[in-house]
Design a protein with these regions (language model features):
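Active-site nucleotide/adenylate-binding loops and adjacent lid/helix of ATP-dependent enzymes
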Residues: 1-83, 104-105
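Glycine-rich phosphate/pyrophosphate-binding beta-alpha loops
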Residues: 117-129, 176-190
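Peripheral (often C-terminal) accessory segments that flank ATP-dependent C-N-forming ligase machineries
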Residues: 199-286
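Flexible, glycine/charged-enriched surface loops at secondary-structure junctions
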Residues: 83, 154-158, 207-213
C-alpha cells in the first residue's frame, strides 16, 4: 500500500516494517523519534489470536515500549510483519473516513465519506469510527481515485486518513478491502449498497458517477457520549444540533427487524455511555 502511495505521490505516515517470523530481525529502537504507532500488518491473522496484552493498535512512547511490543507479538506466535509508523498528532476529529466503489476498470463510480467525531477507545476495537459527520474533501477524493485506477481496484474500498496539522496534508493510513459497518454512511448519502453490487457483478450495468454525501450523521453512540467526550466545542455543537433535529442514523436500526434484534441493537447503543466513560473518563469532555 505505502509503496503505491509513494509512487503516486499520495501522502502517508513515515513507515517501517519488521518481520516477526525472522529470528535475525533486530530493531534499533533508539534510532526512532517518539511517539510512534505499531500495529500488525495482517489483521485477519491477528484477529484469530488471543494472548495477554493484546491490543488492536499499540501506542509506543519509548524505545523500551517498541521492543516489548515486538517481543510480545513474536512470543504469541504472530508470524507476519509489525508495522511501525510516525504518530500523527490530533484528536479523533482529525481522522477522515472515505469509502469508494469502483468498476472493473478501476474507475471510482461512487464516493462517500466524512469527518470522524469519535472512534472506539477500547483496546480491542480502538480505531473503529463510532460517529462520522458528512464532509467532502476534494484532495482525498482525487487521491483515492488515482489509487483505485492505478491498481485496477474493483468493488468497495474504505480508506483511513488523518489530517496532519503540522503540514496541512491528509495522510493515508490504509485501505480496508471490503465494506464495513460504517459503509452505512454511503446509504445515508443516497447510494444503494446492494444495488451497486448487483449492477456491477451480476447485471454488468454501467454505474453513473455519484457523490453520496447527505446531511445525516452516522452514529453508534447516544447523545450523552458526544456531550461528555467531544472536546471541540464547535464540532460538538454541530453534532448535537443533528441529534436534536433528528438527522442521525444508526446502522443497527431497521424497523423490519425482530424484537430480539431491536432489543440487542438498543442495548448495544446505550451501553456505549458506560464503555466510553470507562475508557475515556466519566467527566464532561474527559
Amino acid at each position: 500500500f505505502y509503496a503505491i502511495c509513494e509512487e503516486l505521490g499520495i501522502d502517508y505516515p513515515k513507515t517501517w516494517t519488521f518481520d516477526c517470523a525472522d529470528p535475525d530481525v533486530a530493531i534499533d529502537a533508539e534510532s526512532f523519534t517518539y511517539p510512534l504507532i505499531a500495529k500488525p500488518s495482517n489483521s485477519a491473522r491477528y484477529d484469530l489470536m488471543d494472548f495477554p496484552g493484546k491490543e488492536k493498535v499499540y501506542e509506543v512512547q519509548t524505545p523500551d515500549d517498541l521492543l516489548r511490543i515486538f517481543d510480545l507479538l513474536r512470543e504469541a506466535g504472530y508470524d507476519r510483519e509489525l508495522v511501525v509508523q510516525d504518530f500523527i498528532p490530533g484528536d479523533d476529529d482529525a481522522l477522515r473516513s472515505l469509502t469508494t466503489f469502483s468498476d472493473a476498470s478501476g474507475e471510482v463510480r461512487v464516493v462517500s465519506g466524512g469527518r470522524v467525531v469519535l472512534q472506539d477507545h477500547s483496546p480491542a476495537r480502538i480505531g473503529n469510527p463510532m460517529c462520522i459527520l458528512p464532509e467532502r474533501v476534494d484532495r482525498i477524493i482525487e487521491d483515492a481515485k488515482r489509487f483505485c485506477k492505478h491498481v485496477g481496484y474493483r468493488g468497495f474500498g474504505n480508506f483511513d486518513i488523518k489530517f496532519d496539522a503540522r503540514d496541512g496534508s491528509y495522510k493515508f493510513f490504509e485501505i480496508n478491502t471490503r465494506p464495513g459497518r460504517n459503509t452505512y454512511y454511503v446509504a445515508q448519502g443516497g447510494a444503494n449498497i446492494a444495488r451497486l453490487l448487483v449492477d456491477e457483478y451480476i447485471l454488468h450495468r454501467e454505474i453513473p458517477y455519484q457523490e453520496a454525501y447527505g446531511d445525516t450523521l452516522y452514529t453508534c453512540v447516544p447523545k450523552k457520549v458526544i456531550e461528555r467526550h467531544v472536546s471541540n466545542p464547535e464540532l460538538r455543537d454541530e453534532v448535537l444540533d443533528m441529534y436534536r433535529s433528528g438527522h442521525t442514523g444508526y446502522p443497527y436500526d431497521n424497523p423490519r427487524d425482530t424484537f430480539a434484534h431491536k432489543l440487542y441493537a438498543r442495548v448495544t447503543f446505550m451501553h456505549q455511555v458506560q464503555k466510553f466513560d470507562r475508557f475515556m473518563g466519566s467527566g464532561k469532555n474527559a
